[in-house]
Amino acid sequence: MKEELLFCPLGGSGEIGMNMNLFAYGKPGEHKWIMVDIGVTFADDTLPGIDLIYPDPGFIVDKKEDLIGIVLTHAHEDHIGAIAHLWPQLKCKIFATPFTSVLIKEKFKEKHIDITSYLNVVQLNGIVDLDPFKIEYITLTHSILEPNGLRIETPAGVILHTGDWKIDPDPLIGGKINSNRLKEIGNDGVLAMICDSTNVFSMGKAGSELDVRKSMLNIMSSLKKRIIIASFASNVARLETAFYCAEKTGRQISLVGRSMHRIFKAARQCGYLKNVIEPIDPREAKNISREKIVYLCTGSQGEPMAALMRIAKYTHPDVFIEKDDTVIFSSKIIPGNEKKLYNLQNQLVKDGIEVISEENEFVHVSGHPNREDLKEMYEWIKPQCAIPVHGEHRHMIEHIKFAKEMNVPNPVQVENGDIVKLYPGTPKVYDKAPSGRLYLDGNVSVVEESQSIKDRKNLSANGYIEATIMITPKGSMHKRPVLTFRGIPVDDVEEFVYGLEDAIEDITRTFKLGSKQQEHNLIDALKIACRKFSKEKTGKKPFTNINLVRI
């Protein structure tokens, strides 16, 4: 049978975040695979106790003997965040540029995994030979250091996987987009381009970090009191802008938040941020007058445990905020975070603190391509096939329309699990791989249907009842049950307790407890009775636990 070239997204197609993409080449049954990116997304309030969500890698785990490498485009969490959680199931080589390598080493260190013999550091614009794939890293621009597109060469043709990108003429830190090489790649012929869809609805160009710096300097020059800047820690160009503006306005700067320190250290380790003023410890910054300090902190999305939220609640041990200070949100609002972020901003304004954000000043540009950026990339690459990824369904469908406007002969719409045959023949979805999500519950990966998640949702919505019942040797109830309940809206506690005790006694009297099976039957009946009683009295059907104790 003839060799074939396949593409299969397991995450990031039909959603923003959690990127995981597979490429395969070879005869059916003899494919060799590479994985591009292995990211996470973050849970919302509908999943209490869950922090991270990542793609279910089961499809490729079953083929791990033929997985010859994980190739990482850049260091954002939605592209590398799952690597330390999922790699132990895959145990293959990893390829990344220096900055990304530093950050993933930290992730494995936290898991006590020695990745040294598997991690391959690729220099910027370097080449990786993973037969039958020859992968060339192409420097792009984005909202993080060292973003890369991948030119993936196979005997069947060339694929350009863009990763996350935009066209920034003045990125301030790191290299400019390698437009000359991209044009050469396009002129040599590209079978398919796998492309970022995030900002397909945004007109014009994405904008430059240099323009943000000019605006930030103008804003900060007019402020007289304490300044707190909240930004994504991973945006090192924005970090450098904060340092630059602090120095130009005669202020010192202090980093607040674990992620800020981690990214600053990694950037320094890779040779960046060498010419900025030295940050001072927040404990030292307390002794500096309000007019002479800038704090750069985490928490731009209103995260409950991040530095900015603690500062706003006056619970941070080192950073104090007061009336007439200013908080600058140099970031966009990630969809889903609006409520908690606006609550934070309202609290700040209520306390007499000025809030500056992209809603009222120019303090942020996106790291993803607007339509003019996309147009330019399509003109450079001229792909025969376009496959939109990194977007919700509405983004990807609009991107398909855009690709048609750019005269791409074969745009292909995909969702997670779709297997696209790029060669031979016209590119199209021809099969489906199993795909899904895994949830990090504590230190354990679970599926959404897991009992722990179901129980926690139930507890969160309906509360909890526990009844402990003493059973005599003759099988009857000894005294009244011991009751505990939480999260149930009870007006008259005494009335509720007495009523619940009566319901338990009524059920228990009807049972003879001579065997384990009879005990199990009683427990089931008591659970039903307790939930029914609570539903009638409070409208809640709580999670219920029954303990039978023989005396």
Protein language model regions, located:
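His/Asp/Glu-rich metal-coordinating catalytic cores
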Residues: M1-V71, H76-N287, A306-F320, K339-L341
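Solvent-exposed loop and beta-edge segments used for protein-protein assembly and interaction
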Residues: E15, I144, S289, L459-A461, ...
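Conserved hydrophobic residues forming the short capping helix/wall of the S-adenosyl-L-methionine
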Residues: F108, A403, S534
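Broad gene-expression machinery/nucleic-acid interaction feature
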Residues: P132, P147-G149, Y464-E466, T544-I546
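Flexible glycine-/small-residue-rich
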Residues: T139, T154, C297-G299, I469-P473, ...
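Hard-cation-handling environments
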Residues: F201-S330, I334-E359, V363-S515, I523, ...
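C-terminal tails and terminal domains of large nucleic-acid-associated
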Residues: S515-I551
